[in-house]
From Swiss-Prot:
Pathway per the UniProt entry: Purine metabolism; IMP biosynthesis via de novo pathway; 5-amino-1-(5-phospho-D-ribosyl)imidazole from N(2)-formyl-N(1)-(5-phospho-D-ribosyl)glycinamide: step 2/2
Main localization, broad class: cytoplasm
GO cellular component annotations of the record: cytosol
Lineage: Bacteria, Bacillati, Bacillota, Bacilli, Bacillales
Entry EC no(s): 6.3.3.1
The protein's name in its UniProt record: Phosphoribosylformylglycinamidine cyclo-ligase
């Protein structure tokens, strides 16, 4: 075989090895609706087996952002795969959709099979937890596009929901309750600022913070909310949901509210992880701005009728999710979110 391609910076054999290494991880994620296996030009999924009357497909795509830089610098690659899945499936979950399948895209300076395997293992772990088939993907070696050791990861998720069960916020009314589901930490947003503060502080990321190495705190993967929220949806009528990502409370909570309504949030009603206090102090950041950047301890919200709030909290507790009644819906023509206690 000609070495011309390899001399241009593309190692075909490393790509083959990466595929071989990832195959066992991918197989763990398969669902009965998946038709065929890996290696085809297009991945296929049989919707007729879902037993839905009028399925609506919901799709989403996202990446992990500059959190990748920390993972690359410290050689911790598996948790990044979890982040890639979580950012996508949590987004489509806000419509009430059950995630069905996921595709990944990994672009890198040079294919290192061991690193690709770690990333795909994390992706597969998250797919197994959320019953999402890893149905396809692409690994691209682009030496001229990335510095040595660098890579980027993006994901694409597709789910389905019965048309009559689609959650779009149109039933939000005054007096309904906002329930917040605890985050696992910073999740995958705000890392350009996080990395800046890390560099300015000069901290040793191997040193401990709150009984854990700093690096483990910063790379804690985004929490997956699929199982608990779908369990809740079976028992309680959910009026709206939000995934608290980039833009924090201020940008994300209003996205599911009809015009003329606001979520009045009591910021003293839930605990804020200590890492946010560290970031705020290190950067001398205004509290309002913190809520405009980070999740501040709440990674996902659901809005339910007041009569269903206690039951919803009980169901979430049974799903081993920390959840809090953090606010309620009010009429407000001028703003869609009111934060109390900041």
């Amino acid at each position: 075989m000609s070495k011309a391609y390899e001399q241009s910076g593309v190692n075909i054999h490393a790509g083959y090895e990466a595929v071989e290494r990832m195959s066992s991880h991918v197989k763990r994620t398969m669902r009965k609706e998946v038709i065929g296996g890996l290696g085809g030009f297009g991945a296929t999924f049989d919707l007729s087996q879902l037993n839905m009357t009028a399925p609506v497909l919901v799709s989403g795509t996202d990446g992990v952002g500059t959190k990748l830089k920390l993972a690359i610098d410290y050689g911790k690659h598996d948790s990044i795969g979890i982040d890639a899945v979580a950012m996508c499936v949590n987004d489509i979950l806000t419509t009430g959709a059950e995630p069905l399948y996921f595709l990944d895209y990994i672009a890198t300076n040079k294919v290192v099979p061991e690193v690709i395997e770690q990333i795909v293992k994390g992706i597969s772990d998250a797919c197994v937890e959320t019953n999402t088939a890893l149905i396809g993907g692409e690994t691209a070696e682009m030496g001229e596009m990335y510095h040595e050791g660098e890579y980027d990861v993006a994901g694409f998720a597709v789910g389905a929901v019965e048309k009559d069960d689609y959650v779009d916020g149109s039933e939000v009314k005054e007096g309904q309750v906002v329930i917040g589901l605890a985050s696992s930490g910073i999740h995958s947003n705000g890392y350009s600022l996080v990395r800046k503060l890390i560099n300015e502080s000069g901290i040793d990321l191997a040193s401990n913070f709150d009984n854990r190495p700093f690096i483990d705190v910063f790379l804690e993967p985004t929490k997956l909310y699929v199982k608990p929220v779908l369990a809740l949806k079976k028992e309680v009528s959910i009026k709206a949901m939000n995934h608290i990502t980039g833009g924090g409370f201020y940008e994300n909570i209003p996205r599911a509210l009809p015009a003329g309504y606001a979520a009045r949030i009591d910021t003293t009603s839930f605990p804020t992880p200590k890492i946010f206090d560290w970031l705020q102090q290190q950067g001398n950041i205004d509290t309002n701005e913190m809520y405009n950047i980070f999740n501040m301890g709440i990674g996902y919200t659901v809005i339910v009728d007041e009569k269903d709030a206690s039951r919803a909290l009980k169901i979430l507790a049974e799903q081993n999710v920390e959840a809090y009644q953090i606010g309620h819906i009010v009429k407000n023509e001028s703003t869609a979110i009111e934060l109390l206690g900041v």
